[in-house]
Amino acid sequence: MPVSMAVCETANVVNAALRESLGGNSSAAGSSIDQAKSGEDSNGSLQNHIVANAKRILMAKIEYEEVPNYHESVLENLKSKYIVIKPGNPGAINGFGGKNNTGKVVGANGHDNNGARKQAEHPNNQSHHNNHNNHPHPTSNPNELPKPKRVLYPRENIRIGWKQSERKWQVGTGMINVGNTCYLNSTLQALLHIPALANWLVSEQAHLENCNVAESGGGCIVCAMAKTLLATQSNQSAVRPFLIYSKLKQICKHMVVGRQEDAHEFLRFLVEAMERAYLMRFRNYKELDQLVKETTPLGQIFGGYLRSEVRCLSCNHVSITFQHFQDLLLDIRKADSLEDAFEGHFSRERLEDMGYKCEGCKKKVSATKQFSLERAPITLCIQLKRFSMIGNKLTKQISLKPRIDLSKYAARSPAAQAQPLTYRLVSMVTHLGVSQHCGHYTAIGSTDTGSYYNFDDSYVRPIAMQSVCNTNAYIMFYELDLSQAASPAANRPNGVRLTNGHSTTPVPAATVSSPSPTRFIGPQLPPGGVNGYSNGNAQKTAIQFKQHHQQSQQNGFQLGTGKFQDTAKPPLVGAHAKGDANPVPTANGNKSSSTSSNSSSNHKSINQQQYLPISSEDEDSEDEMTPRPTTAQLPSMPKMTDDHTEKPKSPVKIQVKTPVKTPLKSLVPYESASEEEEAPQPNPRKRRSEEDSSESDQESGQTNGHSKTNGSLTNGSASSSVHVNNSKQKTDAIDEIFKSLKKSADSDDDDDEEESSIQLTNGWHPQKQSQSQSKAPPSPKTPPSPAVIKSKTGIWKVTRNDEVDDIDDDDDEEDEAPAKIQTPSKTHRNPFSSTKPSTESPATPGAKRQKLLNGSAVKSHQQPRVGNGYQSEATSNGSTINELLKQSHRGYGSSVLSWNGKPAELEKEPFELVCAKRIAGHGSVDGSDIVESSVAVNASSGSDSNDVVVIALLVDAREQRQRDLDDDEENEMDRGRQRKVKSSGSAKANNASNSTPGYNPFQEYEGQKRWNKNGGGGGGFPRFYNQNFRQNFQQRNKFKFNRFGGPGSAKFQQQRALQRHLAAGGGFSRRQPSAQQQQQQS
């Protein structure tokens, strides 16, 4: 047990030592001679004895005894240095809702809602402040928020809401942008539209008159803000915030005039500059501690305290700390709404494993951390983290609400949490742009009428509540709404004013908890007294309002959210119950609305007497209570008039037998099978206007909302005959060109096949229509498709057959038309390729291309789809396809995959079609032609000749492919195993083999002409009779004889015929056009 020490008196111990020393020395004195010696010895002996006795006394046992004042003198000092884990008096812990140590009665949100500071009885309160000035919280619980020893500006002096001031608040003017100052203008507009801050600035009138800070004639930064606020309230045009702009360096040193800055950064520096300016009013402001500096007006308005609880997962020890904040930075990477961002911010998170040193375990352990609101601020500033780690801006949409409830995030007792902690949106700063380094800032602010305005530099315009909630916000300011937690006798912060300017007595909102069945929205009048009413009269008020509401509708009133239009009597101001949220049409056509957005009204007036001030609870549950129409309508449904609503719905009748010519267009294409197969529409706007013009003559009784005609299919485009063959959609592009060049001999089979496909899904067969009615305008891009109609009888298609017969007849005429035989020249791979005669006239390619583009050809269903299902618009004469076909499909590398990732179809069998296409009509690279084979020359025009030509082409293609394979084996590159021998013969052979494959006789002719022009041996005879030329020709080309399959092959015969022709003098001295060659060969 702690006691105080009681030690015996030192004088008694010294006296005992002297007596003991003197008593021993007195017996030793014997004679007078020895008196002097004995005196000296006695003095030394006395000193030695005193020292020895003092040491013995200091080492003696100490006796203790308890004193009654130990608890007050010692333990109180120890309490200020250590944390009491288990206090002896449980009642010493003071929670919210009760009396704290300073004697102030606080509410559920941490401050006095009644606005009166009350002192509680504390016997030692004055002694604590006098004796322990070094400890501002001598008797407070360590788990509670410490109390400052001095309050610079009481929290109760903050006036919340526009109605707390006697001043009449205007909307405010805009601010002129003086050069990249949109961040400054928007921040100032957001701050000046906070009621608590505006009321404080107006109350600083005495300081404005006596401010001793002379900086450019504008005073301190607080005076500059107050003067700017008064300027925006008094002027009618945009103002220039030069008082703030001139102090930019004083606000923040690194900010440069004319440069873009961050609005939130400027906001933080501006608030700190205002706090410094306020602290300078006190003499010893530098000696004040941090808790006292946080009691400035700016700290009381924006400041709050977060409670951080770190719990050890090993010993469950909880470490509680408090943190002062003036804004909340919310992470929105995983949030889609503001509520989600709050949940993520105040959720429990786990710290790094074994990274927290626990005070109880005295070692590093795993722990969890959670934030909560110890004391909520009056004005909550929220910044959304719209920046990523890589420097980009997060432009995602975050849904907002005009009211938020933070009761579940408050660190209070369950009884105190029952009282709501509600905030209402007062202003915000938005950023427009895709990057955080550039863009434009705007602001949104609320007024005393409850409406919101958008401030874009010097432009000010009203904005609807829905637009405010859907804005890409960056900084938001929410002000505490005390009306939800106010007592019944307390006055309401915002009054109710009618359109004629007369205001009623302010009354508080009915506080309805969640179990209460009745929910009131908007301003209400009490049924009885003026000072207020209890919750028991709420149901009666709702009934009375419902009756008056019906009467007001008959009288022609329009009850809006922010305005009242008085036509006969003053309407009764009230609120809708939750069950009566649906608007009811009035007698004069107007509708009453139960929403709380002022900007949702359709009428705006300059005179502010026409606005109804919305109180703080008028906007409650704004997102929950929205007017819903009686009948749900889809966006695609047309607006039904009164006449249509009374008509009974009748089943839709579809008539196909008798087409009637009307200006109405049929609505068939909107239900086409696919986007690519929709029937073309000539002009959607024109068609729509025609439908509107004749809408009065038609019935509109459908359930899907689409307007119908009288039931007949009148538009030819809706019933145009287009035959779709799905089995032809994967044909190769080159196969398409090859089939378009040759004339089809089996058109009758195609017609039979098409006729079999002309039937409807559910068995309906349409009647044939005339040619004039069924002609549809051609579509230059989209291929036509059979129309699909959805009705109650099922899904069916409409096609016709007359156009097919007409197109077949046209094709037969083209087949029978005589055409000149065109001899295509050699190709890059095959110099002696046989070709087929072209049966097209010079005008045929253009007509054929036009038919293909219009989509009206018979074989349109046979046209393949190139790529990802899109149809190629090019025909056989297209330059791009011709250029691609001239190139080798084999290339110099491995096979190339197609666009859809599958192996190309130009391998194996399709190669025959490629060779056939080359032989058919593309000629050689240099544009010259060769003599075609006898099979092609003797072939006659018509279907028989086409079959013969096709068979010959396929045979030649297979042989050419085999020769190419053999040529590849012969021309393999030397890999070093075989030594190259340089000789004249091998050099010629190598030159021939390394050159372009195939022999070019015309190049040989030109070369021999240059060699033998002045040389001897030839004389004046033609060089064709020179035997050296023939020997050289044979010597150079003998290695190709085996390649052509021997003397019996067709290609060998072609080569020999050409050689004989050249040897007989049939060569050409100059290249001639293709037409002259054909005439000469014929």
Curated annotation (Swiss-Prot):
It is found in: Nucleus, Nucleolus. The modification Phosphoserine is found at residues 514, 516, 672, 674, 747, 779, 785, 841. It comes from the Eukaryota. Belongs to the peptidase C19 family. Keywords: Hydrolase, Nucleus, Phosphoprotein, Protease, Thiol protease, Ubl conjugation pathway. The keyword Hydrolase applies. Its EC number is 3.4.19.12. Interacts with atms/PAF1, but not with CycT. Pfam families: UCH (PF00443). CDD domains: Peptidase_C19E. Residues 532-542, 701-728, 822-842, 857-882 have a biased composition (Polar residues). Its main location: nucleus. PANTHER family: UBIQUITIN CARBOXYL-TERMINAL HYDROLASE (PTHR24006), UBIQUITIN CARBOXYL-TERMINAL HYDROLASE 36 (PTHR24006:SF758). It is an enzyme of class 3 (hydrolase). This is Ubiquitin carboxyl-terminal hydrolase 36. Residues 173-481 form the USP domain. One of its GO terms (cellular component) is nucleolus. Required for maintaining multiple types of adult stem cells, including male and female germline, epithelial follicle cell and intestinal stem cells. May function as a transcriptional repressor by continually deubiquiting histone H2B at the promoters of genes critical for cellular differentiation, thereby preventing histone H3 'Lys-4' trimethylation (H3K4). Controls selective autophagy activation by ubiquitinated proteins. Residues 747-756, 803-816 have a biased composition (Acidic residues). GO terms for biological process: germ-line stem cell population maintenance; negative regulation of macroautophagy; protein deubiquitination; proteolysis; regulation of apoptotic process; somatic stem cell population maintenance. It catalyses: Thiol-dependent hydrolysis of ester, thioester, amide, peptide and isopeptide bonds formed by the C-terminal Gly of ubiquitin (a 76-residue protein attached to proteins as an intracellular targeting signal). Residues 777-786 have a biased composition (Pro residues).
